[in-house]
Design a protein with these regions (language model features):
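Acidic, polar ligand-binding/catalytic clefts
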Residues: 120-185
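C-terminal motif of bacterial Sec signal peptides marking the signal peptidase cleavage site
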Residues: 18-21
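Extended ligand-binding regions for polar small-molecule ligands
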Residues: 35-65, 115-116, 177, 197, ...
Length: 331
């Protein structure tokens, strides 16, 4: 985990993420110590990122007809308890410059949903692994943490979509690897990935196809914390890291130590991956969550949040409940 001073330095360079994602522009201008990062021109607009704990989030109004659909047990408690990972990299879910407040696009979308449902948002900061257990047990009502819809996850959870999912292949800046676009490109490489993620499924599928074709197998290494896999990448213990495109693009831009050599849909080659809010299977919450998402998509609040975090290119036209997900892994 970066120190507070290192975190501040990284967050001060946050606008670079959006330049990396768009492939345009020049370097950023750091902001003041107040936590409001300096302006950065992107196309014809100027983007300002607030990394202070006082987020002034985009808010939405309650919609009584949708709020009435929330299961009575949750509605009666007056809170929407959202499981979220808070130790990641911008712009998804990360800590503000007070090193304790969870901010990012995930918590902002969760706030909009809670508003429409007439509930107070309570964020439950947890690990990636514990997030699934917390939702399954009912400890958390819903998970917002860059979760991709998969067919296997749909056996246990319900999903309401709110973003498209793109993944990136990230290498050291001086790596001889220049492009990863097909399974053969990773044959024989040492690749890190998060356990239990959709990118792990894609990686294992590509490796299986390589083995079947007689190519060298991938050496898969598992890391959950960014500090760990980036140290492994820098030291040469791994050749490539495979993770979410927004966070990888951010790291490549602000560190100067890595580069993006390819991207792929979070659903693999057969389907466009979709990021979704995750609820307990059959508990009745997923439909009002989806309705709330469609409300803020239609009234423009959703677009405001995505624009705020530089993720307008990951917008969807409508939220769906339990759409086709990443295919089951063949055994």
């Amino acid at each position: 985990m970066p120190s507070p001073s290192r975190r501040a330095a990284l967050l001060g360079l946050l606008p670079l993420l959006f330049l990396a994602a768009c492939g345009t522009g020049t370097g950023p201008r750091a902001g003041s110590g107040s936590g409001a990062v300096g302006a950065q021109a992107v196309g014809d607009s100027t983007l300002k990122i607030n990394t202070s704990p006082e987020q002034n989030r985009v808010r939405a109004g309650k919609v009584d007809a949708i709020a009435a659909k929330v299961p009575a047990g949750i509605r009666g408690g007056g809170e929407l308890v959202v499981g979220i990972t808070g130790d990641g990299i911008p712009p998804l879910s990360f800590l503000a410059d007070d090193d304790s407040t969870v901010i990012g696009v995930e918590s902002d979308i969760a706030q909009l949903v809670a508003d429409v449902l007439g509930l107070k948002l309570r964020l439950d900061r947890t690990s990636w692994e514990n997030l699934f257990l917390a939702v399954k047990s009912g400890k958390d009502h819903v998970g917002f943490s860059n979760i991709t819809v998969t067919e296997e996850r749909k056996d246990i959870y319900d999903f309401a979509t709110y973003r498209v999912d793109q993944l990136a292949w990230e290498t050291a800046k001086d790596s001889k690897i220049t492009k990863i676009a097909r399974p053969a490109d990773i044959a024989g490489l040492k690749v890190s990935v998060g356990s239990g993620t959709n990118q792990e499924k894609i990686l294992l599928d590509w490796d299986a196809r390589n083995r079947k074709a007689g190519l060298k197998p991938v050496e898969v290494q598992y890391y959950q914390r960014p500090a760990d896999y980036y140290l492994a990448l820098k030291s040469g213990r791994i050749d490539v890291h495979f993770g979410p495109n927004p966070t990888s693009a951010y790291h490549a831009a602000v560190s100067g130590d890595t580069k993006i050599v390819g991207t792929v849909s979070g659903g693999g080659e057969s389907i466009q991956g979709l990021i979704a809010a995750m609820t307990q299977k059959g508990d009745g919450l997923v439909q009002p969550v989806s309705d709330a998402l469609n409300t803020v998509i239609e009234n423009g609040k959703y677009a405001e949040v995505l624009k705020r975090w530089g993720l307008s290119n990951e917008a969807i036209p409508a939220s769906q409940v339990n759409p086709p997900g990443l295919p089951r892994q063949k055994k």
